[in-house]
Amino acid sequence: PCRRGQEWKRDGAVYRVLWPPQESMELSSNDRSCVLEVTVGSERLLITGDVSREVERRLLLEVTLPVTLLVAGHHGSQTSSGPQLVQTLLPQYVLYSAGRRNAYGHPHADVVRRFRHAGSCQWSTALDGAVTFHFVESEGVTLHAARRQPWRRDGVDGTCVGVESRQ
């Protein structure tokens, strides 16, 4: 199991577990999610699992800024990706891992709106299929979406595609 403080290096990337703490059995199963920060050069990825906004606020003291790519918490549900997290991290890219036509309508419209107002480029596996981000130390970030259909959603800016929620 992952525990806060674990760290390792591989293939030029530094992996750091930010959550959960050693004593975490009193937390809900969502709040025991593994939160992982991956750094390659100056680019940073943050995966927050299903942690709640309360845990997100605690994590803000641990995260190294800036964050290039954030995998949105809990598939983009309204229980995660709170305003404080969004405004502190201001990620360049946000990825929602959600099933196509999922019953919960993830990502939630409020979450999409928060990231849109923060200027983040947003991608969703529900619409874009498999999304691959490559972090290369000297080249920055490149992205490939298996099923890119920009006509199905609003643009965040001229070079970036936004997602829409069913809610």
Question: What role is predicted for each listed range?
Answer:
Residues 1-167:
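Non-globular, low-confidence helical/coil segments that flank catalytic cores
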